[in-house]
Amino acid sequence: MVQVSKRAWLLGLLCVFLVAAFHISSIQNRYMRDDEEIAFRTTNQDLSYTIWYQATQDVHAPVWFSSFWIWRQFIGDSEFMGRVYSVFATMLTLALVYQIGRTWFKSARVGIFAILILGANSYFFTYGLEIRPYAVNMLVATLSMWCFYRWLKRRTLFTALLYGLTVALMLYQHYFIVFLVIAQALYLLFFARPTRQMLVQIIGAWLLAFLIWSPWFPVAIHQVETLISIESGFGNARGVAGIGSTTEPTTLNGILTLVNLVTSGQPGLYLLVLVIGLVYAWRKKSYWLVMLWAIGVPVVALLVNMVFSVYTPRYITYLSIGVGLVMAVGITSLPRRIQWLALIVFVAISLWSIPSQFSPRIIKYRDLYQQVAKKAEAGDVLYVEPMNSGDNVVWWQMSHYLTPDLFKSLTNDPNQAQMARRIWFVTNDWFNQDVQTNFKKLEPNYPVQQVIGDCNPLWCYLIQLMEAPPSKTPQTFGTEMPFWGTDVISVSHSSVDVHLWWKVDRTPNMSYSIGLQLLDSAGNLVAQADGPINHYGNETVDTNAMQPGKIYIDYRSLALPSGITAGTYQLQLIVYDWQTGNRLLQADGADHLMLDLINIP
């Protein structure tokens, strides 16, 4: 029996780490939203400022923000590590879930199954990775339920007061976890059949919680008064009080949306497992406690929301723990030989459904800026239009994922931008007339080299690299072929890739051939590529078809001989009449132009 228990414990631990690994590996697919940026901004200074800000400038309880401030000081303050903090909290939550399954239902399998079900549940997954209080909300709610059940079993004043401490912790963590306390009270009244002694103990526990929370109580009252004033001023007020701007009304559509989110978009599957568990476990009081956790909490929240503006799905994420336990009980009610198979099918469907719960309208700023950072060069300028100083998420992402020099170069002045050779033209309003006008002013001298992002019916965010020629003044072949410089793109032992920049004032009369040559130190020809302009590498343009004033970028690749010796080589450019071989001369009489020296590895 001890050996079985130890194996179950080790399996539970393994499942916790598997879920944690899955969540950590998924961080790269989660993207910052407005509230997460606020979490960083309000914890940027010292701890006293963090608490002061929540007390006087916001409407939140202080524990999570204080703990996040501490996490940032000692662990790290990147977006990734911010999400790791939430994963750390979920690991502790899942460890408690295992204990609940083992003790409430006398089945380690219930705890193990609940861990895996929660790990694949989109509701738990989404808010378990947010840089907001929700992961810790789930932790303290689970701890409170654990202590509440422990008191119900032992019925001692000590366990009651211990439970009371968790209630105080919940109030300091997030005000709306109080819905769980209401669910606990309902269970006590309708299922536990409390004795007079139990009522005295629970009242004592709640009084202790309020006593501990009382120093913050005036702050909470002030927050409510401030909130009412602000909501009324902006016309967002809904109900007697609450947060009208960030909550939603209790409607049938809102309820269906919550059900869809809680069930990972599979309400039929969850309902089936719920019915199975209900048939086989309805006599167990512990089952009704998790049912109230899973269903009672949202019912209470939605009812209260009809009077006070207190509901949005993220405020009651802790109900997901109850849902996971209800599902685990349902699956373990099946014949033992098919329980693991049923779990695998359930988890697989849930994992498959997770992507469907994410909005396709999310702009993946981090990915876009990281691409820019890889391509950025010294001297680049970031030109943003329109400039929205209030878009804090964008500024946070830019400051953390662009190179420091590029972020410092940020401007919305097109004249200042043109002082640089390379401009990163950034816009979230591509079809705006002013944006189009300024883009078209830049484009003749700064042709687009690369486009990062997209503009589609779901979202629009474009970052376009616009680049001027390397030289401010040309070197002209003959009288018709001004050459504006060279960019050496890559050099390897097998090839050299080069961009040649051309712009003419008038269309040449002839179709010239352009030759890019590679010479060794003795002046011997090693490699050569001849032909018309290969514009952007995909359009052949004869010189007698060039449009005046348009910049042409000739993509050239020199294939090097296999036996080439490593060393320094000279690039050389010629322009000639391909019919006669006669070269165009430069002003100094030279029939060639020396370009860059390159080192062949």
Where are these regions (language model features)?
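Hydrophobic/aromatic-rich transmembrane helices and adjacent perimembrane loops
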Residues: 127-128, 135, 179, 267, ...
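Membrane-interface alpha helices of multi-pass inner-membrane proteins
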Residues: 50, 114-115, 127, 159-173, ...
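Catalytic lumenal/periplasmic loop and adjoining terminal transmembrane helix
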Residues: 214, 340-462, 513-516, 521-524, ...
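Hydrophobic, aromatic-rich transmembrane alpha-helices
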Residues: 93, 188-190, 264-287
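Membrane-interface transmembrane helices that cradle and orient dolichyl/undecaprenyl
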Residues: 144-162, 331
